[in-house]
A protein has these predicted regions:
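Membrane-embedded alpha-helical bundles of multi-pass integral membrane proteins
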Residues: 1-284
């Protein structure tokens, strides 16, 4: 299996970062509770409970507000649904820091669950790449972009940011189409670093899940007693990747186990960094 020193170091680091993340998240929850409890209760807010609850759930599941943007709707839906489904891979990740062939009880080798995991790992990865490209192409939400919709773009931009780029250097004419050439980025007013942080967290986590599935296939295929699980039935979308890993590692179980430890640690640390940040930045 994996190098004992490497496994112990990654395990200890994961536990330390996780403890700090939980404390940060608890602090964030307490802050939100204090803020909410400072308000005046509205006895009728929840009524009718069923109708309001269904409205929230149906709006989230159908993404009906994303009208006219089918690709963005599909990408965002895949990313959203991948969150709860891939949570269980985080649990697996902790265990794999110590036992690299670990799988979840009951679900670990349950083919429908494995298919679901891989579909949403790849789907979440593709979805977040689409959303990142859309955000990049939509502009950065700068004062210069916002000024494009003004009757005097250069004057408005200079008033908002004297050192900024004159809108006239970006594009003329300036259609009102929510693009960098038009009314400005649709993300105007959002905090860009927060968006980039969330996007990269999702990208890294989904990529780690895909890579780990391939590594699991590889280590199962070279481990006596587990090789029966190394098949397309259990790894429908990552068996090809696992075969590449087997060849690259020259069928060395130790090399594959070390790789599992490193990728699992990256996934855990990335997830806990996200938990820490949202505990500090409760307005994200």
């Amino acid at each position: 299996m994996a190098n004992p020193t490497l496994s112990a170091i990654m395990w200890g680091l994961a536990l330390l970062v996780s403890a700090l993340a939980v404390l940060s998240f608890a602090r964030g929850l307490a802050h939100m509770w204090r803020t909410v409890s400072a308000g005046t209760p509205d006895p009728g807010r929840l009524a009718p409970v069923g109708k309001r609850a269904w409205g929230v759930v149906s709006a989230a599941l159908t993404h009906r507000e994303c009208k006219g943007r089918p690709w963005i709707k599909a990408a965002h839906w895949l990313v959203m649904v991948s969150f709860p489904i891939l949570f269980f891979t985080l649990v697996t990740g902790y265990a794999q820091l110590r036992v690299q062939t670990f799988t979840l009880p009951l679900l670990g080798h349950f083919a429908p669950w494995e298919w679901l995991t891989e579909v949403f790992a790849w789907g979440g990865l593709a979805g977040i790449i689409v959303l990142m490209v859309v955000r990049q192409r939509a502009g950065h939400g700068t004062a210069t972009e916002a000024a494009l919709s003004n009757d005097d773009p250069d004057g408005a931009a200079a008033a908002a940011d004297p050192d900024g780029t004159p809108p006239s250097s970006l594009s003329r004419p300036h259609p009102r189409d929510s693009s960098p050439r038009g009314l400005a980025s649709r993300f105007l007013g959002s905090t860009r670093w927060q968006a980039l942080f969330v996007e990269w967290v999702i990208l890294i986590v989904c990529a780690c899940v895909v890579v780990l599935r391939g590594l699991e296939y590889a280590i199962f295929s070279v481990t006596p007693g587990l090789d029966a699980h190394a098949s397309a039935l259990h790894f429908p979308l990552t068996a090809w990747l696992g075969a590449l890993f087997v060849g690259a590692a020259s069928s060395s179980a130790t090399s594959l186990a070390n790789a599992i430890v490193l990728v699992s640690a990256l996934k855990v640390l990335t997830s806990m960094t996200w938990l820490t940040v949202i505990g500090i930045q409760t307005g994200m």
